[in-house]
Regions:
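Terminal alpha-helical segments
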Residues: 1-125
């Protein structure tokens, strides 16, 4: 296990704490960040270059040549929207209203499943 993997595992553990503490929007942001990090790691591994400074998960998966099914693509597209730092206030307010326990748990579980699947993509030829 390398430092990056240890860090990603720690983030997954932290996310469950955010859910328990009702920090739902933070939890969803970190779901995005965790998937972004693992995808950027795959980009580096497979292209032997630095990962681009982008945050769109579907684009990172494409660059890393990860074969995703339609459901996975849809989930990554939705989870990308959880990275809202530079968005307009109206967008943020709409997002925050969605961030209840059920919505957050749903996407936490989807993110965890995607993360574990992507983890298996390492060293895959």
């Amino acid at each position: 296990m390398n430092i990056g993997e240890t860090e990603r595992n720690a983030v997954l553990a932290l996310l469950s704490i955010y859910i328990k503490g009702k920090k739902y929007s933070d939890c969803l942001f970190f779901c995005h960040l965790t998937l972004e990090k693992i995808l950027k790691g795959l980009v580096v591994e497979r292209t032997k270059t630095h990962a681009p400074y982008i945050h769109k998960l579907v684009d990172l998966a494409r660059i890393a040549k990860v074969k995703l099914n339609e459901e996975q693509l849809n989930h990554l597209s939705r989870i990308t929207k959880f990275n809202i730092a530079g968005r307009y206030d109206a967008f943020k307010q709409t997002f925050y209203k969605k961030c209840n326990k059920e919505y957050t748990e749903k996407y936490f579980n989807i993110s965890k499943k995607l993360y574990l699947w992507l983890k298996k993509e390492y060293r895959k030829k």
